[in-house]
Regions:
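N-terminal mature ectodomain segment of secretory-pathway/periplasmic proteins
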Residues: 22-95
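Beta-turn initiation residues at beta-strand->coil junctions
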Residues: 78-79, 97-99, 183-186
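Hydrophobic, well-structured mid-protein blocks that either form specific transmembrane helices
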Residues: 85-124
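Mature, folded catalytic cores of secreted/periplasmic enzymes
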Residues: 6-11, 33, 177, 185, ...
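Bacterial Sec-dependent signal peptides at the C-terminal "C-region" and cleavage site
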Residues: 1-17
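Gly/Pro-enriched, hydrophobic low-complexity segments
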Residues: 22, 104-106, 114, 118-119, ...
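Beta-strand-connecting loop/turn residues
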Residues: 72, 91, 101, 175-177
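Short, surface-exposed charged micro-motifs
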Residues: 63-65, 84-85, 135, 167-171
Length: 224
């Protein structure tokens, strides 16, 4: 059913900001409510990777498009510092590098959980799935861009996930109950911060959004 224009966007999930302390159960309950109604998300994104040993900080800026379904579809389009497009679709990933006109293809058949455990963590993830993969702890509300924001600390349970991540901090919008920031920490101390803004929720995203528009003569390379 099409939504009236006035109900589209992050505000459709808006609730009055709590005046009493939230619990982990409160946050997960709100996230479950959002997950049941979530269909699409588009947002401006900033990825910042930090390599602690050499004190290196690299930032990529772009846009995220997500359509929920039995097989979620995700397209990430980076515009700075270099143009790059990443498409996740039907247990496959494609990475397009316009400068060299090449698409690198990855088979994710054996890693179907990759999107939900990393890139889409918190986007439509129900509490059952979250607590099945992570020990969940509520860190309280912390300031982020001038807004007191609930923060969940996730510690991986499966050994294969724990081998890559020591923990994840999810900063959850108290209006949309979707992540506005994900912080992924590696055992080495290195970390990635994914920040989302200008979020638009449940607006129509057609099939054409989830396609890579490559230049003529693009080279395709299978990576696994």
């Amino acid at each position: 059913m099409a939504l009236p224009a006035g109900l589209r966007g992050a505000g459709m999930f808006g609730r009055a900001v709590h005046r009493v302390p939230l619990t982990v159960g409160d946050v997960l309950s709100h996230m479950d409510d959002t997950a049941r109604r979530l269909k699409t998300v588009s947002a401006h994104l900033t990825y910042t990777t930090v390599t602690v040993l050499v004190n290196d900080r690299a930032t990529q800026v772009g846009a995220l498009f997500f359509r929920k379904g039995r097989r979620p579809e995700v397209l990430v389009r980076f515009s700075k510092p270099d143009t790059k497009v990443i498409l996740f679709k039907k247990n496959r990933a494609e990475v397009y590098y316009p400068r060299i006109n090449q698409i690198q293809e990855y088979d994710l058949e054996r890693r179907r959980d990759l999107l939900q455990q990393f890139l889409l963590l918190g986007f439509g993830t129900g509490s059952g799935a979250l607590e099945g993969t992570y020990h969940v702890r509520y860190l309280g509300e912390k300031p982020l861009h001038g807004t007191m924001t609930p923060v969940l600390e996730l510690t991986p349970i499966p050994k294969d996930v724990a081998a890559q991540l020591s923990k994840v901090d999810l900063w959850i919008s108290p209006q949309s109950w979707l992540p506005v920031q994900q912080e992924f920490f590696e055992a080495s101390g290195d970390y990635l911060i994914a920040s989302y803004s200008q979020m638009r929720i449940n607006e129509p995203l057609g099939p054409s959004v989830f396609k890579i528009r490559a230049k003529h003569g693009v080279e395709r390379v299978k990576m696994n």
